[in-house]
Every structure is written in structure tokens, then in C-alpha cells.
Amino acid sequence: MLMRRITIIVILMLGLLQSCCAGVRKYGVEVVKEYPHDSGAYTQGLFFQDGQLYESTGQYGSSSFRKIDLATGKALEKVDFNRKYFVEGSVILGDELFILTWESRVAFIYDAATLSYKSSYSYPREGWGLTTDGKQLIAS
């Protein structure tokens, strides 16, 4: 009786395992173009806004926010952060640039056009990803 139960359980588990894996789709990718990038930049946030590429980079001692020339990979403009901050996600909403930090739990606000510092505030958790739906900020 015990052996029969074990056999039934094993058969059911194998059936479930097979049905779970049967529906997995595989996708391929094709690289159509490559662009240069600063290999020393530890990318945390990356977005396009009005045809311009922006990147926030994080590392204690070398965090920055950059407006990037896509063709060369060079920073057209750059904001460096105090070495105590590990910068994470960033996004522009309206005329303001929002930048989160990781363990410091600080959010920065800059003028999006000039990259001039406006303010900072305490953020209630670790900052990670940041995006927008065009009306409000969305953080992970």
C-alpha cells in the first residue's frame, strides 16, 4: 500500500513538472547596433528623454549622474556625488531630475535642464529603481 502511494505521488509530480516546463517560450535576440560606453561606469539608472541618453552610476566614492553623447559614450555633462553616496535610479519628471541613493536613503532633486542642485530629502527606504508614468514617480 505504501509503495503504491509513493508511486502515485511520483507520477503526479513528474506530470506537474512536465506541464510546467512545456509552456516555456524561448526568445532570441539580434544585436542591431552597439554604442561605446565608459567601462568604469557602474550603471544603476539609464533612460532616454527627448532623444537624449542619461545615466546614473553608483559606487561609493565615484557615483555620478551623466548626460551622455550616444555616439561617443562620453559624458556631455556630469554631476559627481559625495563619496558617502551610492547613487541608484534616476528619472526626469517635468522640469526636475530625481535621483535615489541606496543605503543612505536620500533622494536628490536637480533642475533637469541645467543639472543644478535644488534640494534633497530623506527617503524612507533603500533607493533602487526609479521611473515615471509621466504624472508621478514610481520607485522599486
Regions found by a protein language model. Name each.
Residues I6-G15:
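Sec-dependent N-terminal signal peptides
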